[in-house]
Amino acid sequence: MPKVGIIYNDIKPVAGRVAIELKDKLTAAGWDVSITSSIGGILGYSNPESPVCHTPIDGLTPPGFDSEMKFAIVLGGDGTVLAASRQVAPCGIPILAINTGHMGFLTETYLNQLPQAIDQAIAGEYEIEERAMLTVKVLRGESVLWEALCLNEMVLHREPLTSMCHFEIAVGRHAPVDIAADGVIVSTPTGSTAYSLSAGGPVVAPGVPVLQLVPICPHSLASRALVFPDTEPVNIYPVNIPRLVMVVDGNGGCYIFPEDRVYLERSPYSVKFIRLQPPEFFRILREKLGWGLPHIAKPTSVELP
């Protein structure tokens, strides 16, 4: 009996309703269906009383999800896809992401096209697009305090009402550099269209094997976004702040103290996205972010000669 998974956003009633309906339909068609919510992929935040919230990378896979599963249907928005990625990437399960959220930059299709999408996926009429992930670790000495898989980005920044941060950052075996800024972002190509883009980083096509380091509000004109090979690990040391905040993929993180370091490297795991049509990254940029649209003059209240 073929296996399929369903991961849904349990905060959205429509996603939960569709998940149950889809489970019944696939079960009746002879599929072994495992269903879970994306809450299992949410990392959670630590608090000052408990500064470390440890989430083992291999501990997020839901019961019933394994490498024998043909694919997993994800019902939600981009946040749900980010959480689901951590749940299934260690098993190599492909994701068919159905948008029930807002922008849906990472999703493949919309809810009103769900029946056709399921039929096409069951028939095997799709391509697989792999997206690189990061392994993020917080180390104190050689002890791992916290670790997580990351599809978009890791952000390390100051707390509100605190002064500017200094970071000592070493990329690979290159000489460390000092960056003065409100924070720093290390992102994958997938994350280049998220927080990194808003902070002034470049857009990187998904298949390019690079990472990027983007300062947040740097205190120097010389501190600009850096793109480097994803074979280079990154070590980040806080220099002058009692405590920093680290956030991974916008949905979890922990506090970083002066005695800690943040270590990042390309993960051996990747996310496998089911593409029902040949992937067209520039088309998605155009549709979702308005990239490359022709400039249209805005109407003016002044009549020009």
From Swiss-Prot:
Catalysis: reaction(s): NAD(+) + ATP = ADP + NADP(+) + H(+)
A Gene Ontology cellular-component term: cytoplasm
Pfam families on file: NAD_kinase, NAD_kinase_C
The keyword Methyltransferase is assigned to this record: no
Cellular compartment(s): Cytoplasm
Location, primary (coarse class): cytoplasm
GO MF entry, a single one: metal ion binding
Record keywords: ATP-binding, Cytoplasm, Kinase, NAD, NADP, Nucleotide-binding, Transferase
Organism superkingdom: Bacteria
GO BP terms, alphabetized: NAD metabolic process; NADP biosynthetic process
Residues at which NAD(+) binds: 78-79, 152-153, 182, 193-198, 251
Enzyme class: transferase
Cofactor(s) required for function per UniProt: a divalent metal cation
EC number annotated for this UniProt entry: 2.7.1.23
Leader sequence segment: none
Catalytic residues of the enzyme: 78 (proton acceptor)
Gene3D superfamilies hit by this protein: Probable inorganic polyphosphate/atp-NAD kinase, domain 1, Probable inorganic polyphosphate/atp-NAD kinase, domain 2
NCBIfam families, per the entry: PRK02649.1
Similarity section: Belongs to the NAD kinase family.
Function description: Involved in the regulation of the intracellular balance of NAD and NADP, and is a key enzyme in the biosynthesis of NADP. Catalyzes specifically the phosphorylation on 2'-hydroxyl of the adenosine moiety of NAD to yield NADP.
Name of this protein: NAD kinase 2
Protein source organism: Nostoc sp. (strain PCC 7120 / SAG 25.82 / UTEX 2576)
Organism lineage: Bacteria, Bacillati, Cyanobacteriota, Cyanophyceae, Nostocales
Gene: nadK2
